[in-house]
Amino acid sequence: MRLSKYYLPTLKEKPAHAKIISHQYSLRAGLIKQIASGIYSWLPLGLLVLKNIEDIIRDEMDKSGAIEVLMPCVQPANLWRESGRYDDYGKEMLRIKDRHEEDMLFGPTHEEVATDLIRDVVKSYKDLPLCLYQIQWKFRDEVRPRYGVMRGREFLMKDAYSFDVDYEGALNSYNLMYKTYIKIFKRMGLTPIGVRADTGPIGGNLSHEFHILANTGESTLYYDNKFSELLESEDVESLKSIYAVADDMHDPETCPISQEQLNVSKGIEIGHIFYFGDKYSKPMKASVTSQDGKNVNIHMGSYGIGVSRLVGAIIEAFHDDKGIIWPESVAPFRIGLINLQTKVTEAADKIYKALKSDEVLYDDTEGSVGVKFSRMDLIGLPWQIIVGKKAIDEKIVEVKNRATGEVKEMQIEEAINHFSTK
């Protein structure tokens, strides 16, 4: 993509209302634009990151055996009355009426819709286990939207729902999603900490939140220092058994590990999984015939990932004082190609044409060298190919690693081959 043909409205100065680095860089790098409190338009560069995150999630969810669906944003209130949850939600639920004066709502979550989706069709234990997921926009009218996409009112979420005939099956589904989440977050370059958590308005008796460590996190995490070692093994039962909790579940008096073993860190929540048995299937009459001929309520779980929140979380984890440093797996473009002067245009064009255009953002604008370098560092593409005077005299370009800052000279053909084969 040629920058001269692209829409990338970057900002030179830090917006005064943006308090944390991910919010500042999201606005300055032209990822998002706020249109109301907690509501954002996603601009081209930000949308590419969002789609790359979605692709990783879809790939791992599909590998787990989950099946993608798409449920409506707007839901009838009667489904929530049926589950008994309509009055549990306060003003964070956006309630509306249609032209027939029927009560509707903009879904903050989809447990009721998911239960309704299967209850008239799934009637036998032979139809289970089943796991359905979607990537869909949601709305929660937060009292204090803040931190950009980290705590917005409208947000993109991956939510999945598992259906099993009994507790053992439901626990298997829960453990599978726990393991799948670890794989998803690790592919994004993140180190997730799974902590025991309160089930909140979703309900149930088993729940884990997934956090990444960040000084700007709103939660305080208490976890055994062995957690990071076990993370590599992806041994779910061991990870679940080790001490790891958020601040609302930590009691210093009953903590089973010593102070020397206990790590205390700030964290950003990026995912949450729940097992809630028949909390929804019982009132909504979602049941199956078991293997021994009995009619039993379906055991359910739900599994959420904040897709749009992940954009902010990744920036919090990967940045410096110059800008964002995207992990290659989620970067909007892999390479930033910088043309430093008009007389090297032919060499820069050659490199651009030789590489995949959807992996390269080619700065072919007439701005100053300083502006070009600053902008490319700000948007944080993993690699920069800098085409200067040596491209004419010696057929040499500079290749910069954005994460390490290391700059290496390469012959033009060498650089083309290097990035064409990776």
UniProtKB/Swiss-Prot annotation:
GO biological process, one term: prolyl-tRNA aminoacylation
Keywords for the protein's UniProt record, in alphabetical order: Aminoacyl-tRNA synthetase, ATP-binding, Cytoplasm, Ligase, Nucleotide-binding, Protein biosynthesis
Main localization category: cytoplasm
PROSITE patterns per UniProt: AA_TRNA_LIGASE_II
Cellular compartments annotated: Cytoplasm
InterPro entries documented for this protein: aa-tRNA-synt_IIb (IPR002314), aa-tRNA-synth_II (IPR006195), aa-tRNA-synth_II/BPL/LPL (IPR045864), Anticodon-bd (IPR004154), Anticodon-bd_dom_sf (IPR036621), Pro-tRNA-ligase_IIa (IPR002316), Pro-tRNA-synth_IIa_bac-type (IPR004500), Pro-tRNA_synthetase (IPR050062)
Substrates-to-products reaction catalysed: tRNA(Pro) + L-proline + ATP = L-prolyl-tRNA(Pro) + AMP + diphosphate
Enzyme class: ligase
Top-level taxonomic group: Bacteria
A single Gene Ontology CC term: cytosol
Listed GO MF terms: ATP binding; proline-tRNA ligase activity
CDD domains: ProRS_anticodon_short (cd00861), ProRS_core_prok (cd00779)
EC number: 6.1.1.15
Family: Belongs to the class-II aminoacyl-tRNA synthetase family. ProS type 2 subfamily.
Function field: Catalyzes the attachment of proline to tRNA(Pro) in a two-step reaction: proline is first activated by ATP to form Pro-AMP and then transferred to the acceptor end of tRNA(Pro).
PANTHER family named in the record: MITOCHONDRIAL RIBOSOME PROTEIN L39/PROLYL-TRNA LIGASE FAMILY MEMBER, PROLINE--TRNA LIGASE
Assembly mode: Homodimer.
Protein name, as recorded: Proline--tRNA ligase
Organism name: Wolbachia sp. subsp. Drosophila simulans (strain wRi)
